Amino acid sequence: MPKLKTKSGAKKRFKVTGTGKVVSAHAGKRHGMIKRTKKQIRQLRGTRILFKTDGDNIKKYFLPNA
């Protein structure tokens, strides 16, 4: 059976760390920022580590070769 291909959309959005955790950018920063406080905007910077169950699903279905 051939190897599963990595989903190209997931390849652009998620990264697997050396310890196997899945990292992604925070959601909610594309538009509508005028409604948010400065603190909310500041907290959306950088990346976040996904919960273990979500990360496991991402690795299993979308990043099979990671």
UniProtKB/Swiss-Prot annotation:
Keyword Ribosomal protein: yes
Record keywords, A-Z: Ribonucleoprotein, Ribosomal protein
InterPro entries (alphabetical): Ribosomal_bL35 (IPR001706), Ribosomal_bL35-like (IPR021137), Ribosomal_bL35_CS (IPR018265), Ribosomal_bL35_sf (IPR037229)
A Pfam family matched in the record: Ribosomal_L35p
GO (cellular component) term, any one: cytosolic large ribosomal subunit
UniProt keyword Ribosomal protein, yes or no: yes
One Gene Ontology biological process: translation
Record GO terms (molecular function): structural constituent of ribosome
Similarity comment: Belongs to the bacterial ribosomal protein bL35 family.
Alphabetized PANTHER family for the sequence: 54S RIBOSOMAL PROTEIN BL35M, LARGE RIBOSOMAL SUBUNIT PROTEIN BL35M
UniProt protein name: Large ribosomal subunit protein bL35
